[in-house]
């Protein structure tokens, strides 16, 4: 893990934090962090888990390129997956059932039917800003998805996305509803003051800027 990832993963894995919203840039490892925490939930805490992605195609690709290699590369998880690499009812493109009885689902977020029937402990959303705002006129993705964790003793909702249009972005809205907002701070190389990084422009005396050649 990288230094900025540790607090995020600690929040994702904590039973005392019910909801985590990660407003991120591209290529920060959100999907890998999410899968690492999910592996912890499945193997150690024995929780049922579910991840939604914007479309069915995204979900199938995620299962093939991220989930299956994660199972292969984590020995304790692979030990719970005797079906790995085989055609088996517990090994499909939408669901993995482990020998400890825990299930993992990976579904597309466009259809309302994908938010029904499942009862899980952990609900996750990857690239929330790319989801439809209203799923077939039944409600927002997080409204529908978080109903799946209402019966859990330790309910958890993890949302993450690169933000899109300010004011209409779902991850921005979700984060703004939280009473707590945390940023990663780094020390100034000149004075040592802890600060979070900002982009500047020609009008501001601060921030990250590009010098013309």
Protein language model features and the residues they cover:
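Phosphate/NTP-binding elements of NTP-utilizing enzymes
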Residues: 1-213
């Amino acid at each position: 893990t990288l230094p900025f990832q540790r607090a995020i993963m600690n929040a994702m894995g904590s039973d005392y934090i019910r909801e985590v919203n990660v407003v991120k840039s591209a290529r920060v490892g959100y999907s890998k962090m999410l899968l690492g925490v999910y592996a912890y939930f499945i193997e150690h805490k024995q929780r049922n888990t579910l991840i939604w992605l914007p479309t069915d195609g995204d979900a199938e690709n995620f299962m093939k390129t991220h989930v299956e290699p994660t199972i292969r590369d984590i020995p304790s998880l692979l030990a719970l997956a005797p079906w790995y690499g085989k055609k088996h009812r517990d090994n499909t493109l939408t669901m993995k059932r482990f020998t400890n009885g825990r299930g993992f689902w990976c579904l597309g977020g466009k259809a309302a039917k994908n938010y029904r029937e499942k009862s899980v402990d952990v609900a996750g959303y990857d690239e929330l800003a790319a989801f439809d705002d209203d799923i077939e006129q039944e409600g927002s993705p997080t409204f529908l998805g978080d109903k799946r964790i209402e019966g859990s003793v330790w309910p958890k909702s993890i949302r993450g996305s690169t933000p899109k249009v300010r004011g209409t972005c779902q991850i921005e809205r979700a984060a703004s509803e939280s009473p707590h907002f945390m940023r990663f701070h780094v020390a100034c190389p000149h004075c040592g003051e802890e600060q979070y990084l900002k982009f500047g422009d020609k009008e501001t005396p601060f921030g990250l800027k590009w010098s013309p050649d």
